[in-house]
């Protein structure tokens, strides 16, 4: 069994209403899928976190090391590709591109052996997961406080048990949003906040102290990811558990953050941290440090499927009669090709997502959607 082709599919949809996080503005949704084909006709799919066109370029740069290789040798291939660009970058695009490749290889491996990736990872602990809704970005020409409150009330009505809102736009305004959302969703729905590294240490500590009374499950990315000491200071300086990890990439970045005592909750993104081969190592590191894992998810149905396979195989920590079950991030911002790329969408029904049990990722790609949402040439 040999790899014969590596392809990327650039997807894009321009938004009618742009929106912002604390760190960047979105006027479109853009993602890249990775397709790897083998000499026996088996095809695997993956996805990369981050800017689509640069990721595609790095995937193609890696392809020379992939053609002719046995796709089942995922650990060997991962090490070779990582080493190929090691001197130029141990994080960033070299890892996000490698993630999409690794996911596709595991999809192939699962199809070859007739088993879901979760089974190849060691077995399924669960057949479904509860999801929390992500949204509440700052939209143009609307009142942010009322817009966020009404949006999260809708998510409650859809059956979600938890939601995450965007902050980082200023302490006083953010507190008004948090208060309005809590009032709109009631006292029982879990609420998380995500600053997208938009605060200084002082601002984050002030916000955390004043927001804690609203019953916040975690405070995500309070400061920029390079400042691990700042993370630790925020964690020590206010009462809300601190979360982060989508931008640290790979076991080495996660190890440094965990060693610094930066977070209570680690959020690796399968499409950015190195894929299935790497997230298993990251999960072990988190367990050794007594830190809970809640994967970050921001992409198409391919990423949703990958996250579900990993979460099916996540061992409870600790194993007990009533274990702490993982929860899945479920992006509810506008993205018409998120589910369209799949022949059978992976939707949250009453806030619960069923985990596919077919071979590999357990999904089939809708190639018509790849054509419909193809990114225009530059």
From Swiss-Prot:
Using the record, list the residue span of the signal peptide; answer none if the entry has no such feature: none
Positions marked as site (Increases basicity of active site His): 269
Sorted UniProt keywords: Isomerase, Magnesium, Metal-binding
What is the enzyme's class at the highest EC level? isomerase
- Where in the sequence is the active site? 296 (proton acceptor)
The UniProt entry, under SMART domains, shows: MR_MLE
Catalytic reactions of this protein: D-glucaro-1,4-lactone = 5-dehydro-4-deoxy-D-glucarate + H(+); D-galactaro-1,4-lactone = 5-dehydro-4-deoxy-D-glucarate + H(+)
Alphabetically, which GO biological process terms does the record hold? amino acid catabolic process; carbohydrate catabolic process
Q: Which residues bind Mg(2+)?
A: 194, 220, 246
Listed InterPro entries: Enolase-like_C_sf, Enolase-like_N, Enolase_C-like, GLI, Mandel_Rmase/mucon_lact_enz_CS, Mandelate_racemase_C, Mandelate_racemase_N_dom, RHMD-like
Q: Cite the GO molecular-function annotations of the record.
A: hydro-lyase activity; isomerase activity; magnesium ion binding
The superkingdom listed in its UniProt entry is Bacteria
Q: What is its EC number?
A: 5.5.1.27
The cofactor named in the record is: Mg(2+)
| pH and activity | Optimum pH is 8.5.
Which SUPFAM superfamilies does this UniProt record tie to the protein? Enolase C-terminal domain-like (SSF51604), Enolase N-terminal domain-like (SSF54826)
Q: In which pathway does it act?
A: Carbohydrate acid metabolism; D-galacturonate degradation via prokaryotic oxidative pathway
**What family is it from?**
Belongs to the mandelate racemase/muconate lactonizing enzyme family.
Cite the record's note on assembly. Homooctamer.
Give the function comment from the record: Catalyzes the ring opening of D-galactaro-1,4-lactone to yield 5-keto-4-deoxy-D-glucarate (KDG) via a beta-elimination reaction. This is a step in the oxidative degradation pathway of D-galacturonate, which allows A.tumefaciens to utilize D-galacturonate as a sole carbon source. To a lesser extent, can also use D-glucaro-1,4-lactone as substrate to produce KDG, but cannot use D-galactaro-1,5-lactone, D-glucaro-6,3-lactone and linear D-glucarate.
Q: What is this protein called?
A: D-galactarolactone cycloisomerase
- The record's gene field reads gci
